[in-house]
Amino acid sequence: MPKFVVMLRVKDGMFFVAEWLQCFEKLADEIVVLDNGSTDGTYESLKAHPKVVDIVRTEGYNEGRDKNLLYEHTRRRNPDWILWVDIDEVFEPNLTRKHFDRLMKRSFVNKYAFRRFHFIDRENFAGSWFRLNYSAGHDRIMWREASSGYFENFILDSPNVKGIKGLKVNTNFRLKHMGYISKDIVDRKKDLYLGLIADEKKESLNEMYLSNEKPIKWVDDRNHPRVILLNGLLNCIQARHIADKVVSRTKSFLINRFRKPTTQNATAINS
């Protein structure tokens, strides 16, 4: 069977550690961790788990540096497939290793993508139209390891792995993002990010508090009619976004293709 390794970058995630390990110990063959200076027992708890086969520590906030270092250590485990997630993200509980084995055995697919749902408490996720539009996208990736893979070297918000070629398939596997359920945790994130982002973007940090959100009750059963209907709605939203992008790019291409040359360009052509 393919070797599946989960990579985790974390700082002071003790609030989520037990739940996270309960999820990924049943899915991953191995877990590789980068701890960015935890002081709350996170490092010790993760290091003690038998599935955690490597753990490295850094100081100072730099996501790009850390993810590339973590990727380097993960590659030493000779994985066939890799998944990067945060400590506050867990899959829906009904998913098993067999679900992932079925994905990994498809030789023509190199990437699988998963949706995240942003929880406002332990039982409800954010259901405003803005948040549903966000969840409609598949923003977590599991990939077949390749030497071309890398993470962009951004201090903040270094996104998913880059450089992995081949077919990507969106799945209906759901990730529960629990990072907003504790105000204390959101406060600490906001204080950290305030020192790292431009002034004009600082107001957007208030969105992390998920205030005035419409709560939607989470249902664990993947085959429940409400879950099937929700996935259908999100698929429609995503299809609309894709159609909008196609129209926009086609329009831009046609405008550039048939735009009349400027006077300067026309003079250059005539000369």
Question: What are these model-predicted stretches?
Answer:
Residues M7-L27:
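Short, well-formed alpha-helical segments that are part of the catalytic scaffolds
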Residues P79-E92:
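Short beta-strand-to-loop acidic/aromatic patch adjacent to the donor-nucleotide binding site
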Residues K47-V53:
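Short, conserved SAM-binding/catalytic segment
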Residues D35-S45, G60-N62:
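A conserved acidic beta->alpha catalytic loop
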Residues K3-V5:
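Cell-envelope/extracellular polymer assembly enzymes that use nucleotide-activated donors
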Residues R65-Y71, P93-S271:
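Catalytic-site signature of metal-activated, phosphate-bearing donor transferases
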Residues F15, E59-K67:
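A short, glycine-/small-residue-rich helix N-cap motif at loop->alpha-helix starts
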Residues N68-W81:
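Active-site nucleotide-sugar/metal-binding loop of Leloir-type enzymes
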